[in-house]
């Protein structure tokens, strides 16, 4: 491809900013990033709020309203840190306590813990043997029993691998069925904590591929030992601010794309009322929104209209002064589809500080079931805080996210990803972002990295 090609990138979240970074590294410098909001980072959003430090003084510190953490297999994020001059070494230590909804500790017997550990080891072994290739970034080929892409294992460190494994077709079934098929149902709790509680859905609805690609056997062990998790003192948003700041062409903020016309081997982009002409287009925002502002072909309409997402919101809340807990709480009783709309987790960010905002996490939809209305879920979450002994005095802010775009088990099995991947480059258009991999920072950046390798090398 011509290194002077003019490239339009839509969206300055992790997918878009990292795509620009990898394009620069590959020798492409004639790009523009359009971001409709006034900041970069997408769901990596870390606003400043008042926290009472160890000396009893109020000071401004970052609070995470979206992305929170990483781990040792965040190889692509580490490349972004290096490029942008940020680090996770100064972040606050993670901690958690498993609680009942009434605020008393959730006790587990030694037998229960042993069963959980045995099933976790069994499932990890199965994933690494029977389902070899399961952890490769992205989804192309999975429904056909193939794997192809960067492998994020500690040994491979994003090296490209590919191969055939017919067993991978089973990853299209719901994760609950996948566990049952492999007689590993007791592993549910191990995977549920970092998956359902952070808004990615319930195991009876979500294809197993999403679960095990995000929480591969190494990563899930990292989540179990919170001391190994990465956090950022200046917030996850600082990673993408750092990348953006070091780009030759930082994102153009407050720049909304309202029209796209692809014709005569060019891409005409209407942004803030003006038309710009490009040679290539990389869409790093929700693909189904392209149906509104773009000029979608029939195949794009058919495929992108199948994308689903999660109704998930976070609230920064304050308890009465002096009643702030000293650690995050997880409520496994509320991580079921019957209890959607209830509080699943609140995140206590700063262990060295006293009173501070807590961030609540609530999921309110399930495929094929009625959504819990936002107002009801908000009020229920506040009641749940009171029930566990942490009554909320003030709500600092609420972020109602467009969250975890994905496809159903049926559409996954029917080759949705293979069909979309076959369109890459058609009409000079490339697709990236969360739905092409998974809705977390690392998976999304890995995909942008691999997209550049595949098509802009």
Describe each model-derived feature in a short phrase.
Residues 5-33:
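N-terminal Rossmann-like FAD-binding beta1-loop-alpha1 element of flavoenzymes
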Residues 15, 39, 288:
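Conserved Rossmann-like nucleotide-cofactor binding loop
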Residues 26, 258-371:
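Mid-domain catalytic core of redox enzymes
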Residues 214-266:
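Helical element adjacent to the flavin cofactor pocket in flavoenzyme catalytic cores
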